[in-house]
Structures are given as structure tokens and as C-alpha cells.
Design a protein with these regions (language model features):
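Pepsin/retropepsin-fold aspartyl endopeptidases
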Residues: 18-281
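Bacterial Sec-dependent N-terminal signal peptides
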Residues: 1-24
Length: 281
């Protein structure tokens, strides 16, 4: 093979593995990812990235105007969202959905639909790829896509016994993990975990729900092990927690690369891997 052609192919192979798009973000003190956006070329909004949804939404508590997003029955279709140099079209917004601190609304994974994308916590950016980038140092973890919501399995070591659970990736929750009622019931977590705080609420019918925060000694994701993980669960009459959450305080401890089909995610520890956990009130 001629040397010039060989050199061209080498350069080309390196080029296609590089990011086709990069989107800068910032991380709030509540562990949420925020991107600066302009919607419909008029409304400047800070949107929280919510990995647990595909569409976008506007918060009733927003501080900035969103007058150029026109809603009908709580839904607005056909919007254009500009983030940095990237323009995303036909974005659906929902109205009046609460979001994280400092944000005017949320934006989901729909802007990456059909593409490989990465969350790079080390460099505060999303990366979008046409082909899979280098996976050196990464480990493959099976991913389950349920109606646009992404789940992975992790092993919880409770009282010395490993127990598997499916976790919804939930970047809107600032803490470590939350257990579903189905997982927590019958496991005596308030006795087997070190409890760091609790709060009880009652509804108008007198039914109660108690939020308890504790410390899980070990959480294993693939071959990676996190220690002393902040873990929340609920007790009481009301059973409202349908899924276990892998929250933002765990998500940020890894860099993530999602395949285009959302069947596999590749993870490796980030600079936050051993950082102290966020304290939930």
C-alpha cells in the first residue's frame, strides 16, 4: 500500500473516533448538570440535563422568561434549542415541571437520539460520536432502556450480603441512591444501614411517609466498588417510590459513554470517584 494512502487512512481512522460535537456544562453544588441554551432563538435558559427523560420541560419556578415557547394543553412541539454551536430542532417541551436548583427547566437525552454520546465529568462536557471512541480504562455495563428511561444493575452489600438491584439513572436527584419500596420492604434497612437522618410527612388523610438516609458500605457497579454510599429509602403507609435511583452523586463518580442503541454503557472512574458524598437534609 502506498505510504501516502496509508498515512491518510491512519489520520482518517483517528479523526472519526474523535467527538463530532462537544457541549460544555457546569455542575452545581447539588451535583446537577446545567447547560446554557437559547430556545427558539429568543429565550436564554439554563436547562438541567435529565438523563431519565428524552424530552425537555420548563419549570414554574424559573427565573428567566420562556415567552417564546408556546404551549397547548401543557405541550409545545417543534422548538429549536441552541446549546453552544449545536442546534437541535423539533424539541418537545412540557410545561410546569419542577427541576433542579439554579435551573429554568430540563432537557433530556432526545438531543442525542441515535448517536453515541459521553458524559465527561473530568472535563465538564458532553461528547457526541459517529463511531465508538477509545474505550481504554472503561468497562462495559449492560443497559436496559424502558420507554426512554435507562437502567443498570448494581450490587448492594447489605449486612455483608450482596443483593442485586436495577437502578434508574436519575441525574435530577442530588444524592447517591434511593431504593424503591419494592426493594426496601422486608430488608430491615433501618437496622442494617447506619442511619444519618430521617423526616416524616403526613397527608390530609393522616397517612405518613418517612424518608430515611443511611450509609451503604459497598456498592458494586461492574468491577468498580464504591464505599460508604449515601442511600435513601422510605417507610410508612404511602408507597410511592416505584424505582430505585442511581443519583447524581454516584453518576458523577464515573465518566460515561452510551452506545447508539442504548444497550451498553461504558464507565470508568472520574476525578470525583472518592469524593465525600453530598449530605441530604
Amino acid at each position: 500500500m502506498p505510504r501516502i494512502l496509508l498515512s491518510f487512512l491512519l489520520v482518517y481512522s483517528l479523526t472519526i473516533a474523535q467527538a463530532q460535537e462537544t457541549i460544555p456544562f457546569r455542575i452545581t453544588k447539588y451535583n446537577n448538570i446545567l447547560v446554557s441554551s437559547v430556545v427558539n432563538r429568543k429565550d436564554s435558559l439554563d436547562l438541567m440535563f435529565q438523563i431519565a427523560m428524552e424530552e425537555a420541560s420548563i419549570s414554574p419556578e424559573r427565573k428567566r422568561s420562556a415567552d417564546h415557547i408556546v404551549f397547548k394543553d401543557g405541550i409545545s412541539d417543534g422548538n429549536t434549542v441552541t446549546i453552544g454551536k449545536n442546534i437541535y430542532r423539533d424539541v418537545r417541551f412540557f410545561d410546569d415541571e419542577l427541576t433542579g436548583h439554579e435551573a429554568d427547566g430540563k432537557i433530556g437525552t432526545g438531543i442525542f437520539k441515535g448517536k453515541i454520546f459521553g458524559i465527561d465529568y473530568d472535563n465538564n462536557r458532553f461528547s457526541v460520536y459517529e463511531t465508538m471512541p477509545s474505550l481504554k480504562g472503561y468497562q462495559a455495563v449492560p443497559l436496559v432502556n424502558r420507554n426512554g428511561q435507562l437502567f443498570i444493575q448494581a450490587e448492594n452489600v447489605i449486612d455483608g450480603i450482596p443483593v442485586a438491584a436495577d437502578f434508574l439513572l436519575q441525574s435530577g436527584y442530588s444524592g447517591g441512591i434511593i431504593y424503591s419500596n419494592a426493594f426496601a420492604d422486608g430488608k430491615d434497612l433501618d437496622q442494617k444501614l447506619k442511619i444519618t437522618g430521617e423526616k416524616t410527612l403526613r397527608n390530609s388523610a393522616g397517612k405518613s411517609i418517612t424518608t430515611k438516609n443511611g450509609i451503604l458500605p459497598l456498592l458494586k457497579i461492574g468491577n468498580f466498588t464504591l464505599k460508604d454510599v449515601s442511600a435513601g429509602f422510605f417507610t410508612g403507609d404511602l408507597k410511592t417510590q416505584k424505582a430505585s435511583y442511581l443519583g447524581a452523586d454516584v453518576l458523577k463518580r464515573f465518566n460515561w459513554i452510551f452506545d447508539a442503541e442504548r444497550k451498553t454503557v461504558f464507565i470508568k472512574p472520574s476525578k470525583y470517584f472518592t469524593e465525600a458524598y453530598f449530605k441530604m437534609n
